[in-house]
Structures are given as structure tokens and as C-alpha cells.
């Protein structure tokens, strides 16, 4: 064939794949140029050249490859859609020598030259062909690319290039890969490249076969499960057991319709949507249990259920007085709060068309532990006959605990607020947010920010719980918060609450509480009668003063409970009457006879006189060790010691502030675990005392004058505060102390030591001192004065502003037994303190 080439042939472009020699293949033509080229070849009995179209084109590049196949048109036929189908017979590979050009007839023609293969070593090529055939047979075992007739054709053929063309055509290679094999005239390299391609294709086919097998197995398993489930459903229908699910769905729809008037539109739609989803979900689906749990939880929320008890402030006052002794100011504020609510209800009934926009305030009871903050909330709930829900916020650091967990999480549930409504079964319970000052922030959010919405009357009408996914009205809930230290509550949250101080009890108040509440309650708990235990007045006073150290009565209750347990033990030891064992026999008594005999025996035992009297003399038998709440004051007046008054989380305390002077250069040393504020107070006090000494407001003893070298006395007198170093100490050094209220006490003790003047031991003081010598007000006055009263202090010096503002809050018992003196400046303090 080479003798007639190169020659110019009509050019056809095949879109999809390369054609190979000795291959008869159908080709579909659509454009006019190709159809004209075929007509020309048929009329002139000419060969044609078919090249494969490129997928990607570069600039100034022909849209087809420069190699293709030379062949003849065996047959052609016109198709209904205007296309032409022809049967092409490939004869030889060819290469385009020059770019194709369009001729006068309107089709492309190009100068074509056949591709000649390089010479090769037949033995070497034969070995490579055998390896290639082996790899092809391996591929044929895992795929359908090589049918048996093609394998036979490969085995019967001896031409290595013909074998390579047959394999390449069967592999359906990508165009660039096929071009690389097609255009290569190195027979050995072609065969080696084909071996690599066949090996990679074998791996791919094996992987696809494994994947298909797994998918098929999974589909079979799925179909099997579906078939079994359908069978199970039919069996359940026959047995009637599937009716329960339908009944549950009907109950959900009925319950939803019954509460529809009380639901917001978004809430109704959300719950209904989930019920509809449940009805479409298979009972064995994992979503079914999640949906059912959500629906039942939301339908348990008491929408439209409210406590109908009309408010009665008289009943509220009676309940508070019944449950709590003293606490006059907190009780008054609570009664005022409910008086406002009662008046609003009365006015609404008279003018129902008028909607009052007044929002209730949030009460927060704050004070030391055990003074009755939570029990006040309990009394409120009893008085207005509403359920009480207590939410402990201490240590809470996950905002989802309040707002609820989103339903995307496993084990999700509504927040504590919604859970509280479900627990109360009313939409207007009394909800106690206990220990609100101990809420913490963490990476899981800031619960205090969620409380802003909950406690804001302007926002809590549409509180959105993440689990519910709709807003819930909390405006009818009475929120009451409790705290020990309001300084730890964030400022925005403090702004939403009204604070009511529940401060420490006096010893007399504790005694009355013990008599009227604690002792009767503990007697009942320990199954003892009032006639069986007598605790004397002196003994009760001793327990309060020596065995407890607290602002409230929680520890006092524990001490009384300890006494009751020991009395109960003593009762059983003194009455060793036990029920005897009986043997079954003919003369065994009936159950009624046994019951009568037991009653008779119990009466005999009860009639026996038993009474334990607890006195100061035998108290040690019932209680272990004393605590010594506040040490009594020293009766002796001393230099360099002053009684200061302090506030602690368990109430007030009397702090002895001591100071020593040591020969030195006028330095001040501070010990006793003092905080930064207290250290600054000491520095201020030292400066104020120096000024008083310089002004000769304070008289100092004479200091030996310095002499010169000749023994003559100098006229210059050394200042006393420059001659000594002061060491100020506050005992109980292991206990951290801070605050500005010890300012006047520190100044007094420094003046005492520098002037060599004793202080009055029966005087105690509290107040912040400024550099100008003024006394500023302080906090915790009630607790401090109660501590002074307990310690036997006779005179307490307090800032004048506290005297004018807070004196009414001081218990009458303390005011009557304590001389409370208001002071404006340090001069008045020193006048009352120094002898």
C-alpha cells in the first residue's frame, strides 16, 4: 500500500473514539461536509481518512488528532433524522502530513501517509506478547471487556501490532492514552505500555467487582429486612397489636386540639408537624422514639393550666408569720409585692377590657446561709397555693441546662425552666432560682445571659427553649432568686431584680426560733413527745453561743437533732421491752388477739415515766465539742489593741487589731493575710495619724533629744513616728481578710501605741477612713453589731451615715443593750476610744 502514498484523501472526524485497522465499525455523520466527503469517495472509489476529535484544544491547533485510520466505505444509509450511517472498513494507520484544507466541493481533505512500524526482535516480542495475553486473560476473568471470541482471536493472531490494536480497542481508553498507543510505531514499547494498562485495569475491575458485591449484599439484606418487616406488620394487623400506635397518634392529635386555644400559632404548628412526621415514620425507625419523646414532653407542658387561687394578702401575712420568726422587713416587702398583684387583679375584673401593662418585679433574697431565704419562698407558695419549683443554679456552667438541648443531640431534653413547668403542672408556679450568685461561665456558654431573658418581664413572655423550638410565656411565673453575695451577680442581671436583705439572727431570735420551730420539728422527726425532752433556757443559750458559729439556724438545728438522737437511744435502752418470739402450735393466738396484746404492752411501756432534762451541766454528754462563736472581750484596757467589727459569710465577728512599735525609721509592716484594700486602709490610717501628731492634736510622750559631739542637746526634736517602726497584725492569719471598714480601728490602734495611751476594751468600731480624716459608711452593719452584742461590747462606733440610714434595721434587743455612737471624723473616734 505504501507505493501509492502519500496521497490526498477526504478527511472525516469521529467524535467519540479511535478506529483501528482491520476493524469494521458503524459511523454516524451529521454535518454536510462529512456527507459530501463520503459521496465523493463513493463516486470516485476513493479511500477516506478518519481522525478522532480532541476533547481539549490549545491555541492554533487542529480540533482533531494528526493520526487516524485509512479505510473504505462499505455501505451507507440515510437516517430519518437527517444523519447518514455508513459502515467503515479500516485498512491501515495513517498520519496527516500537512494541515487539512477545505476544497471546492466543501469538505476537508488532507495529505496522508501510512504509519510504518520499526523493526523488532521477534523472540523478544513473542515473549512480551505471551505476558500480555496472560494479563488479558486475568482481566477477562474479572470483567466483560474481553468476550470469548475476542480471546480466541488474540490466540489465533501472530501479528503483535494487530494484537495490540485489538486489545487497545477493547479497553475503551481515554483519547490521550489511546493516541499515545496509536501513534507509537515502536512495537515493543506499545506492548509494554499495554501490559501496564491491563494490570491497572485489572485492579480497577477487581475493586469495582468487590464494591458491587458489597452493594448487592447490602441491598439483599435491606430487601430482606423490608420483607420481614412487612410480614411483621401484616402479622400485627392480624393480631390487632398495631392498633396501639394508631391509638397513641389519635391521643396526640386530640390532646393537641384540646390545648390549641392556649398555644401560640408557632407552637401548635411545631407540635403538629412532629406528630405528622411520627405518623409517617416506621415504628422500628430510630427517629420514632425521638419524635415520640418530644411529642409527649411538649404535650406534658401545662398550657392553659393556672392556679386559680385568688390572692389574699392577709393569708400571705399569716403564712409568713406562721413559718418564720422575726424577719420583719422581708415580710413587709413580700406582703407589699402581693398587695400590688392583688390590686391589679381586682382592677382587671372591674375593667376587663383594659389590659394593664404593669410587669411584676423579680425578688431576690440575699444573706448568709441558713437565715431562711429558701423557706420564705416555700411560705409564699403555700400562701398563694401554687406549686413550688426549686432550680439549683450553684455551679451551673452550661447554658443549655436552662435553654434546653437541641434535638439534634442524642438524649436531648428541655431546659430546667420548661422541666419545672412540667413538674409543677401549672404555668404560674413559684420558681426559686437558688444560689443565683454561683452561676459560672464556661466554653459551653454563659447561663447568666440566659437568665437575663428569663427574669426580664419585658422578654419572658416569649422565652424560647431550644428543645421545644418555639416560644413559651413565662410572664405568669413568680420568680424568686436567692443569693449569699450579690456582688458576684453580673450587673445586667442585678438590674432586673429587687434585693431584699435577709440578715443574721440575734441570739434571742435564734432561741425563739429553736423553741417555736426547731425543737418541735425535731421531736416529731425523732418520734419523741414534748414531755420526754426538756431543754432549759440556759442550755439553749449555751448551745447557741458555744456550740454554733453561724448567721442562721442550720447548725443549731443539727445540734438539736444530735440531742434528740441520743435521747431516742436512751429511751430504747431504758425501756428494753421487746416483742417475744412465738412458735407455731395448736394454741397459737389469732392476729386480732396478737394486735390487742401488742397494744396493751405498748400502753404499759408508754405509761412508764420517761423524761430527759438537758441542762448546762449534762450538755457535754449530748454534744461533743464547743465552737466558741465569738470570744468575749478582755476586761483590761491595753495599749496597742483595738476591737474592730467585721462581716463574714457566716455573720459578723469581732477582730482584735494589734500593733507594736519597734525602734526604727518609721516603716509600717502588715501581717494577718490582709487583702489589697485592707492594706491601703492601713497606709491611709498611718498617714492620718502622722498628720494628727504633726498638728499636735495627739499628744505624745517626750523622746530623748539627740546630742552633738560636745554633748550639747540639739533643739530639733525627733518625730515619734520616725523613731519607731510599726508592726500591725490582725489575728487568725490563716484567714484572708479584706475591705475598707477597718480604717478607723487601724488609726485608733496606731494612735494608741504612738501616744502610749490605752484603749477602752468595751469599745468596738467600724468605718472607712479617708485621708482627710472623715468616716465613710460601710456595709453589713446589722451582722457587725450583733457580733459586738454577743462579745459583750458596750459601745459601738459607727459612721454617722449608717446611723441615720440603717439604725432601724438593727434588732431592738441589740439597740437596747449596746450604746451605738455615730462618728463623723477620726477626732471623734479617738475621743471615744483612747483613755
Curated annotation (Swiss-Prot):
The enzyme's E.C. designation: 3.4.21.53
**Which parts of this chain are annotated as the region Disordered?**
574-610
Positions that bind ATP = 367-374
Any single Gene Ontology cellular-component annotation: cytoplasm
GO process annotations (BP): cellular response to heat; protein quality control for misfolded or incompletely synthesized proteins
Compositionally biased tracts (Basic and acidic residues) = 585-609
UniProt cross-references to Gene3D superfamilies, sorted A to Z: 1.10.8.60, 1.20.5.5270, 1.20.58.1480, 3.30.230.10, LON domain-like, P-loop containing nucleotide triphosphate hydrolases
Q: What does this protein do?
A: ATP-dependent serine protease that mediates the selective degradation of mutant and abnormal proteins as well as certain short-lived regulatory proteins. Required for cellular homeostasis and for survival from DNA damage and developmental changes induced by stress. Degrades polypeptides processively to yield small peptide fragments that are 5 to 10 amino acids long. Binds to DNA in a double-stranded, site-specific manner.
Q: What is this protein called?
A: Lon protease
**Source species of the chain:** Helicobacter pylori (strain ATCC 700392 / 26695)
Annotated gene: lon
Amino acid at each position: 500500500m505504501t507505493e501509492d502514498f502519500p496521497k490526498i484523501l477526504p478527511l472525516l472526524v469521529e467524535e467519540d473514539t479511535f478506529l483501528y485497522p482491520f476493524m469494521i465499525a458503524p459511523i454516524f455523520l451529521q454535518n454536510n461536509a462529512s456527507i459530501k466527503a463520503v459521496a465523493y469517495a463513493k463516486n470516485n472509489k476513493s479511500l477516506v481518512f478518519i481522525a478522532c476529535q480532541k476533547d481539549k484544544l490549545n491555541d492554533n491547533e487542529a480540533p482533531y488528532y494528526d493520526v487516524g485510520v485509512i479505510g473504505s466505505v462499505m455501505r451507507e444509509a440515510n437516517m430519518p433524522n437527517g444523519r447518514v450511517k455508513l459502515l467503515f472498513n479500516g485498512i491501515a494507520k495513517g498520519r496527516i502530513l500537512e494541515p487539512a484544507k477545505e476544497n471546492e466541493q466543501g469538505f476537508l481533505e488532507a495529505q496522508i501517509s501510512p504509519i510504518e512500524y520499526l523493526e523488532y526482535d521477534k523472540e523478544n516480542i513473542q515473549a512480551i506478547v505471551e505476558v500480555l495475553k496472560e494479563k488479558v486473560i486475568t482481566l477477562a476473568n474479572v470483567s466483560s471487556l474481553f468476550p470469548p471470541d475476542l480471546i480466541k482471536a488474540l490466540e489465533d493472531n501472530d501479528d503483535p501490532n494487530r494484537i495490540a490494536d485489538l486489545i487497545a480497542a477493547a479497553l475503551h481508553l481515554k483519547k490521550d492514552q489511546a493516541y499515545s498507543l496509536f501513534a507509537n510505531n515502536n512495537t515493543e514499547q506499545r506492548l509494554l505500555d499495554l501490559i501496564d494498562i491491563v494490570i491497572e485495569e485489572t485492579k480497577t475491575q477487581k475493586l469495582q467487582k468487590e464494591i458491587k458485591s458489597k452493594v448487592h449484599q447490602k441491598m439483599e439484606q435491606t430487601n430482606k429486612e423490608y420483607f420481614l418487616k412487612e410480614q411483621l406488620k401484616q402479622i400485627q394487623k392480624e393480631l390487632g397489636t398495631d392498633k396501639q400506635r394508631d391509638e397513641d397518634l389519635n391521643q396526640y392529635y386530640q390532646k393537641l386540639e384540646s390545648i390549641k386555644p392556649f398555644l401560640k400559632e408557632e407552637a401548635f404548628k411545631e407540635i403538629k408537624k412532629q406528630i405528622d412526621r411520627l405518623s409517617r415514620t416506621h415504628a422500628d425507625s430510630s427517629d420514632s422514639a425521638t419524635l415520640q419523646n418530644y411529642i409527649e414532653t411538649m404535650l406534658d407542658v401545662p398550657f392553659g393550666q393556672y392556679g386559680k387561687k385568688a390572692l389574699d394578702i392577709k393569708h400571705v401575712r399569716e403564712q409568713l408569720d406562721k413559718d418564720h420568726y422575726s424577719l420583719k422587713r422581708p415580710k413587709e416587702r413580700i406582703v407589699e409585692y402581693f398587695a400590688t398583684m392583688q390590686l391589679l387583679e381586682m382592677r382587671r375584673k372591674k375593667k376587663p377590657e383594659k389590659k394593664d401593662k404593669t410587669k411584676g418585679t423579680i425578688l431576690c433574697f440575699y444573706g448568709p446561709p441558713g437565715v431562711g431565704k429558701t423557706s420564705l419562698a416555700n411560705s409564699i407558695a403555700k400562701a398563694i397555693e401554687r406549686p413550688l419549683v426549686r432550680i439549683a443554679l450553684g455551679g451551673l456552667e452550661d447554658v443549655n441546662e436552662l435553654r434546653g438541648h437541641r434535638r439534634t443531640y442524642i438524649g436531648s431534653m428541655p431546659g430546667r425552666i420548661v422541666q419545672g413547668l412540667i413538674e409543677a403542672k401549672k404555668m404560674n408556679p413559684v420558681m426559686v432560682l437558688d444560689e443565683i450568685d454561683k452561676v459560672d461561665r464556661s466554653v459551653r456558654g454563659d447561663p447568666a445571659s440566659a437568665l437575663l431573658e428569663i427574669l426580664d418581664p419585658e422578654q419572658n413572655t416569649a422565652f424560647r427553649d431550644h428543645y421545644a423550638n418555639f416560644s413559651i410565656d413565662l410572664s405568669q411565673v413568680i420568680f424568686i432568686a436567692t443569693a449569699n453575695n450579690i456582688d458576684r451577680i453580673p450587673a445586667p442581671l442585678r438590674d432586673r431584680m429587687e434585693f431584699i436583705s435577709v440578715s443574721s439572727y440575734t441570739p434571742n431570735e435564734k432561741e425563739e426560733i429553736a423553741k417555736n420551730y426547731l425543737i418541735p420539728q425535731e421531736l416529731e422527726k425523732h418520734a419523741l413527745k414534748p414531755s420526754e425532752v426538756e431543754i432549759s433556757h440556759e442550755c439553749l443559750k449555751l448551745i447557741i453561743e458555744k456550740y454554733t458559729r453561724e448567721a442562721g439556724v442550720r447548725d443549731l438545728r443539727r445540734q438539736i437533732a444530735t440531742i434528740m438522737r441520743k435521747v431516742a437511744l436512751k429511751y430504747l435502752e431504758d425501756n428494753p421491752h421487746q416483742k417475744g418470739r412465738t412458735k407455731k402450735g395448736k394454741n397459737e393466738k389469732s392476729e386480732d388477739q396478737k394486735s390487742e396484746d401488742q397494744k396493751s404492752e405498748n400502753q404499759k411501756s408508754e405509761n412508764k415515766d420517761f423524761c430527759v432534762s438537758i441542762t448546762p451541766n449534762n450538755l457535754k454528754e449530748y454534744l461533743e465539742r464547743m465552737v466558741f462563736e465569738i470570744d468575749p472581750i478582755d476586761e483590761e484596757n491595753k495599749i496597742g489593741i483595738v476591737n474592730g467589727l467585721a462581716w463574714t459569710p457566716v455573720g459578723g465577728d469581732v477582730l482584735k487589731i494589734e500593733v507594736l512599735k519597734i525602734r526604727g525609721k518609721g516603716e509600717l509592716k502588715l501581717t494577718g493575710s490582709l487583702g489589697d484594700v485592707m492594706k491601703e486602709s492601713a497606709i491611709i490610717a498611718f498617714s492620718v495619724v502622722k498628720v494628727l501628731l504633726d498638728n499636735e492634736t495627739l499628744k505624745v510622750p517626750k523622746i530623748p533629744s539627740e546630742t552633738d559631739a560636745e554633748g550639747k542637746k540639739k533643739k530639733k526634736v525627733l518625730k515619734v513616728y520616725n523613731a519607731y517602726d510599726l508592726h500591725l497584725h490582725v489575728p487568725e492569719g490563716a484567714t484572708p481578710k479584706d475591705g475598707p471598714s477597718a480604717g478607723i480601728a487601724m488609726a485608733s490602734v496606731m494612735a494608741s501605741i504612738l501616744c502610749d495611751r490605752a484603749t477602752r476594751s468595751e469599745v468596738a468600731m467600724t468605718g472607712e477612713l479617708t485621708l482627710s480624716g472623715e468616716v465613710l459608711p460601710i456595709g453589713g452593719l446589722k451582722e457587725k453589731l450583733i457580733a459586738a452584742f454577743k462579745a459583750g461590747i458596750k459601745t459601738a462606733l459607727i459612721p454617722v451615715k449608717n446611723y441615720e440610714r440603717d439604725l432601724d434595721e438593727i434588732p431592738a434587743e441589740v439597740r437596747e443593750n449596746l450604746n451605738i455612737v455615730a462618728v463623723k471624723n477620726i477626732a471623734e473616734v479617738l475621743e471615744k476610744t483612747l483613755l
